[in-house]
Amino acid sequence: MGPLQREDRPALGGANVAPGSSPVGVWHQPQPPKEPAFHPMGWSLPKEKGLILCLWNKFCRWFHRQESWAQSRDEQNLLQQKRIWESPLLLAAKENDVQALSKLLKFEGCEVHQRGAMGETALHIAALYDNLEAAMVLMEAAPELVFEPMTSELYEGQTALHIAVINQNVNLVRALLARGASVSARATGSVFHYRPHNLIYYGEHPLSFAACVGSEEIVRLLIEHGADIRAQDSLGNTVLHILILQPNKTFACQMYNLLLSYDGGDHLKSLELVPNNQGLTPFKLAGVEGNIVMFQHLMQKRKHIQWTYGPLTSTLYDLTEIDSSGDDQSLLELIVTTKKREARQILDQTPVKELVSLKWKRYGRPYFCVLGAIYVLYIICFTMCCVYRPLKPRITNRTNPRDNTLMQQKLLQEAYVTPKDDLRLVGELVSIVGAVIILLVEIPDIFRLGVTRFFGQTILGGPFHVIIITYAFMVLVTMVMRLTNVDGEVVPMSFALVLGWCNVMYFARGFQMLGPFTIMIQKMIFGDLMRFCWLMAVVILGFASAFYIIFQTEDPDELGHFYDYPMALFSTFELFLTIIDGPANYDVDLPFMYSVTYAAFAIIATLLMLNLLIAMMGDTHWRVAHERDELWRAQVVATTVMLERKLPRCLWPRSGICGREYGLGDRWFLRVEDRQDLNRQRIRRYAQAFQQQDGLYSEDLEKDSGEKLETARPFGAYLSFPTPSVSRSTSRSSTNWERLRQGALRKDLRGIINRGLEDGEGWEYQI
């Protein structure tokens, strides 16, 4: 049930009955509202029946339902309160008035199964308000109420057990279970769906409700009474999946461990490996959602420490579900294809960053550089074929004085005669074969990922996929036009040249300095520039029409920039981009309105809108620059996964070591050696920079360098000094520096070092 307001009212006695209600609490169903006689916009509806009228009525009903979901829910909750006050039985259950409830239940005419506006019974209301005494009276009088679900669209399927569980009323849960309440009942109402406007998602079963609210006692009670920990909701999510989606990470980790302790060995597959309808296990879902706390918690359960030697620790990390080798839906691919920015933070976690670094340095970067070099040579070959395309002098007479064409395309029979033509033919065949290979490589990925994900994800190179596929089609169109002797091959050839060379920017993602800039360009084009083009089109249409009207009566020979409407549009576009200056002829008098209109156009277009575009692009650059390393790391992962799928296995061996060598089965592991004292010198520099008093923490830093750094908490106590009384701006600056210092110290002392993609010696990988 929804969040109802608890109103302070006097206890309901035997005579205190709502006005207009029967003393026995019989509740009558309200009449359904009548259809409106008029359309919401004021149009009367015809009375004749027919297909058009039926469609019209459906459209009107659909238009009526386009109100806010939250507003509809609020109205139903208000109606629910009204119905409760109109029904003595429901009101007694709400007020926990056991005496009045007993009197009402003794009347033969009392309908104990009556329902409120949400389809709730009196037992639902008693459970909602934690009224244990009223609930016991109702269950004694009508035990079947325990099994009754709510019937409204919002709360369909919810039983009293669901409500008692979510309120953490342990005594009521015990009473309901003792009377046979179903532990497998499913709450399928729209309130319980996983939607953006829903504030909670607790699944559908009472067990998932109990796990999400963090009640360990209720979880144990439900499991003891037969609750299935492997039960899945309509989305295929188990209780472990649902815990991943909860905001309270601490309770989620505790409940996760508790539920796994009940997962016996009578199943072939562990509960952690049960996928939902999207094929995601709880571990993969944690990565896709960017739940770092749960991801680290699960990784702690999957790692095996080999040995510890002072500050050195050798750890084996299980790569199951992480590595893209042998997994069509690996965690690496899921992270780079999701739209959630938080998921990219998983790429900075151990062992994901080490695995990505290992793959990129060993195989990804060399193969990607070779692929880029091959493509550049290929596009140069295609360019040379276009530059030296077969042409011959034009022999037809020119009738149009403005036509200055001198050469024309050769026929197919004349195009391949000389040895120079044969050499060009080899290049053309290479270009055609390359275009076919591009289509064969790209099209399968479209069907595998879907059109939206393949072309819409910037990290995957979405716009570049559009460019390269369009380029390949233009090459094939040029070939067809050449074979059929159709004039105009210059059109697809020109498009192919522009697109082919623009696609060279795709290979900039292999370099940390250039990769993020390609994303900036994409975001500016498809974000800032697209929005700006709408405004620019409106301004150009308005002023071009004005210029055309002004010069409509003038001699076009003296000033022909706005002679006809298409020319006026093009000239205004050039003026907007300041490609040309304002047209003027000082030998004749120009219309006065031209000067006024052009002055307004110059102010709006040049001074206002162009500077607005520059400001928008600057803001986009600032936002992307703050995510530069994160975006480049995601580009590296996407490129690595792409190359791994395309190349044969003999050219890309699997990374890691097989668990059979360590008695860990057939799973693959990555061994990471962590040295926590690598950044001690950098810590000392930070500490000296922020030192403000004598030797409060320098003695600790001068201790034996072999001593193991445990946590940052003791250093935080030594390095926290009282802030002197200074101005507000100085205090704010000091606070920010303090946060920076604390963050740097605590991060380094924990041994969490972001060196997954650097060339330094911060991490060592031994395979």
From Swiss-Prot:
Tissue and organ distribution: Detected in intestine (at protein level). Abundantly expressed in pancreas and placenta, and to a much lesser extent in stomach and kidney. Detected in kidney and duodenum.
MF (Gene Ontology): calcium channel activity; calmodulin binding; identical protein binding; metal ion binding
Region span, Interaction with calmodulin: 133-143, 689-707
Topological domains annotated Cytoplasmic: 1-366, 448-462, 509-528, 617-767
Binding positions (Ca(2+)): 581
Annotated region (Interaction with S100A10), positions in chain: 637-641
Matching CDD domains: TRPV5-6
Positions bearing carbohydrate: 397
Post-translational modification note: Glycosylated.
UniProt record, GO biological process: calcium ion homeostasis; calcium ion import across plasma membrane; calcium ion transmembrane transport; calcium ion transport; parathyroid hormone secretion; response to calcium ion
Membrane topology listed for this record: Multi-pass membrane protein
Residues passing through the membrane, by range: 367-387, 425-447, 463-482, 489-508, 529-551, 596-616
Ranges where the record places region Disordered: 1-39
Result after altering residue 586 to C: Abolishes channel activity
One of the record's GO cellular component terms: plasma membrane
Classification via PANTHER family: TRANSIENT RECEPTOR POTENTIAL CATION CHANNEL SUBFAMILY V MEMBER 6 (PTHR10582:SF25), TRANSIENT RECEPTOR POTENTIAL ION CHANNEL PROTEIN (PTHR10582)
Family note: Belongs to the transient receptor (TC 1.A.4) family. TrpV subfamily. TRPV6 sub-subfamily.
Assembly information from the UniProt record: Interacts with TCAF1 and TCAF2. Homotetramer and probably heterotetramer with TRPV5. Interacts with TRPV5. Interacts with S100A10 and probably with the ANAX2-S100A10 heterotetramer. The interaction with S100A10 is required for the trafficking to the plasma membrane. Interacts with calmodulin. Interacts with BSPRY.
NCBIfam families: trp
Name of the protein in its database record: Transient receptor potential cation channel subfamily V member 6
Organism: Mus musculus (Mouse)
Classification lineage: Eukaryota, Metazoa, Chordata, Craniata, Vertebrata
